[in-house]
Amino acid sequence: MTPNPMTNDLPDPAAAPDSAPLYSPARVRALLAAHGLKPTKSLGQNFLIDGNILRAIAEAGGAAPGENVLEIGPGLGVLTREVASRGARVTALEKDERLRPVLAETLAGLDVNVIWGDALDFDYAALPAGTRVIANLPYYITGLLLTRFMQAPGVVSATVLVQKEVAQRLVAQPGQDNYGFLSAVAALYGSVKHVRDVPKGAFFPAPDVTSSVVRLDFDRTRPQPDPAFVSFVDNALRYRRKTLRNNLRMMGHSGEAIDAALSDLGLRPDVRAEDVPLSGLRAVAAALGVVR
């Protein structure tokens, strides 16, 4: 994806619309109507219009003046403005080219570089060290994007608005109802904190689900997780309510090898995959020769 700054699109800084924040459905409708636009459901365009929540997200993101921030899907630019106005250098990835004139208007005078294209095509590995992600993520690609953030060595944190169900999975611990692969892989890379829930009415148009803000902090002093172990965890937790033994059998391991590994590690033969902590899964993987 080639950077495409909006410098030539932006009006004079004095024209930045500070006096008319987009904090109501009426304001959003008026702005969209002025440009002949409507929200596109297929792109997950539910625009956040609650000023208190926007400020809370920016605050939780923790970007200091001069730090690099990456935003996915700036939409109308309201969160972008909140973060950039605090002195951060914001790069925003936007897929919907129809929003060019809108962002030219709402981001006037701010230190923001908009890159036009699909966020799934962006080279996250090239981000500078210390980059923080602060974004209202498109819900239909949340999992893919979270994985990209985790794997990008320059990204130190991601403060993101996601579906509440996804947030519950991210913060879940082994043995809890929502624990699964996403919970485990997030723990492999660092830690997750629930910031706050966000009601449907904070968006225009309102989504079908409740949302939550979470912050993921990535410990870049750790070595990158072994891909073989990540794949093992994925398969082990794919049917998390089944016994770990059954899941391992579906992975192609022999019953004898599995029984020996579980016995040696003090794990019950009927233990469920969701009840085994990462350290236990790593020990099982080592016993089965998946990792060293």
From Swiss-Prot:
Top-level lineage group: Bacteria
Subcellular location: Cytoplasm
Protein residues bound to S-adenosyl-L-methionine: N46, L48, G73, E94, D118, N136
Keywords, comma-separated and alphabetical: Cytoplasm, Methyltransferase, RNA-binding, rRNA processing, S-adenosyl-L-methionine, Transferase
Entry's Gene Ontology BP terms: rRNA methylation
Record has Transcription as a keyword: no
GO molecular function: 16S rRNA (adenine(1518)-N(6)/adenine(1519)-N(6))-dimethyltransferase activity; RNA binding; rRNA (adenine-N6,N6-)-dimethyltransferase activity
Family: Belongs to the class I-like SAM-binding methyltransferase superfamily. rRNA adenine N(6)-methyltransferase family. RsmA subfamily.
Protein name according to UniProt: Ribosomal RNA small subunit methyltransferase A
